[in-house]
Amino acid sequence: MARLEVDILTLFPRMCAGYLGESILGKAQEAGLLAATITDIRDHATGKHRVCDDAPYGGGAGMVMKPEPLVEAIEAARARLPGAWVVLTSPRGARLDQALARRFAEHGRLILVCGRYEGVDERVMTAVDMQVSIGDFVLTGGELAALCVVDAAARLVPGVLGNAASADAESFAGVEGLLEHPQYTRPPEFRGMKVPEVLLSGDHRRIERWRRREALRATRERRPDLFARLSLPESDLRLIEAGDDEL
């Protein structure tokens, strides 16, 4: 019997529990067609206060989720769900559509990582298989997006819906804009991966140029549809190809 197994990694477990236990998803769990686990990321944090965030290197507003508790939570989830795809919900990710939801349903095992605050430390991406976005807008956290992924995939599992026609897809148009640049926070080195030197330099002009370059590169790589709509000045086109020593 086909079923979908998911583990949602979040700082706010109660935000997900209610939705997963209701309606079609609740019935799917009762029928054994959906197995949903919710993991509190703080269980993998250390110290009295189990801190999971810190200020971003290079300055800026907001806080960034630290790599240690997130990566350890992902590794523990992988041990529970061998072969699962690790999916980070992020505005920087590929757009969730019906085709991707079907891929998730067919794969059958997902670990969904919910971001918070200003984002997650870029070094966490080494433990992530893909990033997924539900649209060109920003939420206060990734929990709603993770629930969208579970809902969209679970309803494609045979037997979850009484009427298979209910799974018809809809299309949504995107809006123009750049994806966000990578974020980093303490420690300066994690498992051999170092924070880019420019973010530690204190040179705000270089930092802003680095962020602009990385945003342009991320958009070109992950959302070529958005990138194609941009009317970029020659300076941006040169910046995309510039090395760190040219910032």
From Swiss-Prot:
Residues given in the record as S-adenosyl-L-methionine binding sites: 115, 134-139
Primary localisation category: cytoplasm
Record's GO cellular component terms: cytosol
Gene Ontology molecular-function annotations: tRNA (guanine(37)-N1)-methyltransferase activity
Keywords: Cytoplasm, Methyltransferase, S-adenosyl-L-methionine, Transferase, tRNA processing
Subunit structure: Homodimer.
Protein name: tRNA (guanine-N(1)-)-methyltransferase
Organism listed in the record: Anaeromyxobacter sp. (strain K)
Gene responsible for this protein: trmD
